[in-house]
Amino acid sequence: IQQEKGSKRMGKVLGIVNRKGGVGKTTTATTLSYLLSKEGCKVALIDFDGQRHTTKLCGVTAPEQLSVTIYDILKCIVMNEELPDKGSYMIRTETGVDLIPANNKLDNFDKLMCDTDFAEYKLKEFVDTIKEQYDYILIDGMPKMGTAMINVMICCDSLIIPVQSETLAVEGMAEFLRAFHRIKSHANAETQQEKTKQCQRKQTDKKEIC
């Protein structure tokens, strides 16, 4: 996995998404970023969820005191302003992962994007500016369908969808994937693969999932 010294980095973008919370999305994002970093990859982790669980799990105890977050960065893009210096927002975690944090300002994301041209591409515009600095960029998305989720879908190269192995959860995932394909069919971007991760498998669930 590790890139050769001096070689161009892959900049592969992975979106960890589900429109339902409590399915292991944040755990998947933080654990995978740690494992990739442990293998020698240079990894960035973007907390794109207003609940800011990823930010807290990475050791930020007071997210509301952060002066620059992913929301502020995207606001600069919308306003056509110069992006903040990387050192003002990037947090190097104990695991060697570069965290781009979130706080409750992200709850205003949909309002920020209202009446914005090409609103679905704003996250991609930012990620493209850092892509060649990393082997992998992981995005922990919001657990709801909306402009923020669409931004992640368009931005990423691959999706990882944590899902519980129970009937209703699988049916919900199927609906999510149908929505995803509709969005991608109208977007000028392609996701190379979709990955489904079964989480919280119940021993009592004896039904096969096909």
Residue ranges and their predicted role:
Residues I1-C210:
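P-loop NTP-binding core
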